[in-house]
């Protein structure tokens, strides 16, 4: 079975940063990479039956940190502290 191709936009506020068509896992990679570089970005997908854009979620980036003992941590988005790194999807 062929994976479904969707049309996505990554936005920061009302500004469109990227517009592309791909599968959902590819969108996760692009959104995470962009959010890691410039901060949180919103992901919108085009809903063809409704003929409109729908917000799918917000990518916040990785903000990873490895401490002196080799433990991976994630800096919180507001830089208020540290959290232990977990594998998770933010969308």
For the regions a language model picked out, list residue spans one by one.
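Short aromatic-glycine-(Arg/Gly/Cys) micro-motifs in beta-strand/loop hairpins
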Residues: 2-15
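Short, mixed-charge low-complexity intrinsically disordered segments
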Residues: 36-91
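A short, charged, amphipathic alpha-helix used as a generic interaction element across diverse proteins
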Residues: 23-42
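A short, exposed loop/beta-hairpin motif centered on an aromatic-Gly-Thr core
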Residues: 14-26
């Amino acid at each position: 079975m062929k994976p479904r191709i969707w049309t996505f936009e990554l936005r920061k506020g009302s500004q469109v940063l990227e517009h592309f068509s791909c599968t959902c896992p590819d969108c996760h990679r692009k959104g995470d990479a962009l959010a890691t570089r410039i901060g949180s970005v919103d992901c919108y997908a085009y809903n063809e039956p409704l003929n409109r854009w729908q917000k799918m979620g917000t990518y916040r980036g990785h903000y990873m940190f490895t401490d002196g003992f080799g433990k991976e941590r994630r800096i919180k988005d507001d830089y208020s502290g540290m959290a232990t790194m977990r594998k998770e999807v933010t969308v």
